[in-house]
Amino acid sequence: GCKDNFSANTCKHVKANNNCGSQKYATNCAKTCGKC
C-alpha cells in the first residue's frame, strides 16, 4: 500500500525541505514523497 506513516504535516515539511531522499522519510512519507 501507499500511505504516509508520519503525520501529513510532517511529510509536507519533509517534501518542502527535500528530505524525501532519506530512507526513513521515503518509507514513512511514501505517499507525499511519491515513492509508491
From Swiss-Prot:
Disulfide bonds listed in the record: C2-C36, C11-C29, C20-C33
Residues the UniProt record annotates as site (Important for binding to potassium channels): F6, H13, S22
Ranges of residues in domain ShKT: 2-36
Localisation per UniProt entry: Secreted; Nematocyst
Annotated spans, Crucial for binding to potassium channels: 24-25
Record-linked Pfam families: ShK
InterPro entries: ShKT_dom
Keywords: Disulfide bond, Ion channel impairing toxin, Nematocyst, Neurotoxin, Potassium channel impairing toxin, Secreted, Toxin, Voltage-gated potassium channel impairing toxin
A GO cellular component entry from the record: extracellular region
GO molecular function annotation: potassium channel regulator activity; toxin activity
Domain of life: Eukaryota
Function as written in the Swiss-Prot or TrEMBL entry: Inhibits voltage-dependent potassium channels (Kv1/KCNA). Inhibits the binding of 125I-alpha-dendrotoxin to rat synaptosomal membranes (IC(50)=22 nM).
Similarity annotation: Belongs to the sea anemone type 1 potassium channel toxin family. Type 1b subfamily.
This protein's name: Kappa-actitoxin-Aeq4a
Source organism per UniProt: Actinia equina (Beadlet anemone)
